[in-house]
């Protein structure tokens, strides 16, 4: 054991020296692949040695004052237009026709192709490959460059656990928007149920607060078409304009090496460069074909509404296959694509963007310039020292003296409401040898507690739950709790029996 400890310390010291002197790669687009390529010792060392954003030599009072003054005196043309703004991050979505040599029985992404051609679009450079959804969404929401963090770091699991950060949601709240997040997967994944209050959201609707009437893929992921009614419901929940950040899940890996029993793919695929991944890729293509149908359904729903709306859709990263730059027509495995749709006239302007530039670019098109990071991207992206200044600004906001805000962070964590529709209990009564709980918006993630002890229950409908072989008595407290498989309580409604 002593020898193992000595070996570890020597390895740690050696790899730390390599990191400090810049002899090894510091960018982990896929942490699992990094462990394979560089080994446990290097990845572990770099992950604990280099976390957060490093302090630049230029980080001085004078430099910060000049940067603040420059941004305060810089502006873009502001508009009075305040449409609904909806971002949809599509899990592992990209155009599979970009893979060299692959043939399809028919086009798997006709809706995405049409919208990309008719509306503003371009390539989107993302910080991850094959995994790391939360890092792409962090860049998109905050405008912060993940390259400035430690290798393999997830800010959701480090700095965002305890701090607020300037974000698109906070910026839009300043001008009267209601802010919402939606995700058709577990609320606790990447700690979103904690982090979203630090990013300025009023509500968060994870799958634990959605209707149980949804379909799953053969591997158990929720299908994305369930997001259409959830987005519509969210838009209907307020009378003012809404900002909705939506994270989809259907395209999530891993993908099966053998087609699931009874599953018949509608799109046939041939010519994939890695023969041992051919079946997996065909399965994946059929999932994004269904996601493409969801894109069409969402646009159709928004077209029918009378409210002016902007919809931004993009892929978070490429799926986990043996892609290299050489296998791709666009020669970059860290690129997905985006488009900006609207139900009112917007000039088509195509440009390639970094994920951390996307929100600022959309807001600039709408004449919205709130927040220092967004304004910085809108006005300084052509500067020679753009990335250096961005890193200094990020450090000041998250780790430094907050000089850009005159020393005091203006963003307070929100009282995050789980779900759009309240889960209520109207009545609890005995019927024969079971308890009936009537109310609203129960689903498959609803659990029943009697006097704080969980009991078996049967979800009959969104309005009725049965508890078998039990009766309640006066002063019993009956609670309906929402939680996923990890048993973390997300919300509770309690009824006291008279």
Language-model region placement:
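N-terminal secretory/membrane-targeting segments
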Residues: 1-83, 104-123, 158-162, 166, ...
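Solvent-exposed soluble domains appended to multi-pass membrane proteins
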Residues: 74-80, 90, 95-467, 471-498
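Long, solvent-exposed extracytoplasmic domains/loops
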Residues: 85-89
């Amino acid at each position: 054991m002593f020898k193992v400890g000595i070996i570890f310390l020597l390895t740690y010291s050696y790899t730390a020296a390599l990191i400090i002197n810049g002899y090894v790669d510091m960018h982990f687009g896929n942490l699992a692949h990094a462990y394979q390529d560089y080994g446990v010792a290097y990845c572990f060392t770099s992950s604990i040695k280099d976390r957060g954003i490093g302090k630049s030599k230029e980080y001085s009072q004078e430099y910060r004052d000049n940067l603040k003054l420059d941004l305060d005196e810089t502006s873009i043309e502001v508009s009075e237009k305040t449409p609904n703004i909806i971002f949809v991050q599509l899990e592992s979505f990209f155009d599979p026709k970009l893979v060299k040599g692959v043939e399809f029985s028919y086009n798997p992404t006709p809706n995405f192709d049409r919208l990309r051609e008719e509306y503003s679009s371009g390539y989107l450079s993302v910080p991850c490959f094959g995994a790391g959804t939360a890092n792409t969404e962090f860049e998109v929401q905050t405008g912060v460059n993940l390259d400035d963090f430690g290798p393999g770091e997830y800010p959701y699991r480090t700095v965002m656990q305890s701090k607020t950060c300037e974000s698109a949601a906070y910026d839009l709240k300043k001008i009267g928007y209601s802010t919402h997040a939606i995700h058709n997967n577990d609320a606790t994944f990447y700690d979103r149920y904690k982090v979203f209050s630090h990013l300025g959201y009023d509500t968060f609707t994870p799958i634990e607060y959605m209707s149980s009437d949804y379909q799953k893929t053969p591997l158990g992921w929720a299908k994305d078409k369930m997001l259409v009614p959830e987005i519509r419901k969210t838009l209907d929940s307020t009378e003012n304009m809404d900002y909705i950040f939506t994270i989809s899940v259907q395209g999530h890996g891993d993908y099966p090496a053998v087609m699931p029993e009874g599953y018949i793919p509608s799109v046939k695929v041939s010519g994939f460069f890695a023969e041992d991944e051919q079946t997996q890729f065909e399965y994946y293509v059929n999932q994004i074909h269904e996601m493409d149908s969801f894109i069409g359904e969402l646009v159709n729903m928004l077209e029918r509404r009378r409210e002016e709306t902007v919809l931004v859709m993009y892929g978070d990263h490429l799926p986990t296959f043996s892609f290299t730059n050489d296998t791709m027509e666009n020669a970059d495995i860290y690129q997905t694509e985006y488009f900006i749709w609207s139900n009112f006239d917007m000039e088509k302007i195509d440009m390639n963007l970094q994920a951390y530039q996307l929100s600022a670019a959309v807001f600039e098109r709408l004449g919205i310039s709130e927040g220092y990071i967004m304004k910085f991207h809108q006005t300084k992206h052509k500067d020679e020292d753009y990335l250096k200044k961005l890193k200094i600004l990020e450090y000041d906001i998250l780790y430094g003296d907050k000089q850009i805000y005159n020393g005091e962070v203006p963003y307070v964590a929100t009282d995050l409401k789980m779900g759009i529709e309240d889960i209520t209990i109207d009545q609890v009564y005995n019927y024969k040898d079971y308890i009936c709980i009537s109310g609203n918006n129960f689903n498959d993630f609803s659990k029943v507690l009697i006097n704080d002890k969980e009991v078996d229950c049967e979800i009959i409908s969104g309005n009725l739950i049965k508890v078998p072989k039990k009766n309640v008595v006066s002063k019993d407290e009956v609670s309906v709790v929402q939680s996923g498989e990890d048993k973390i309580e997300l919300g509770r409604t309690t009824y006291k029996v008279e």
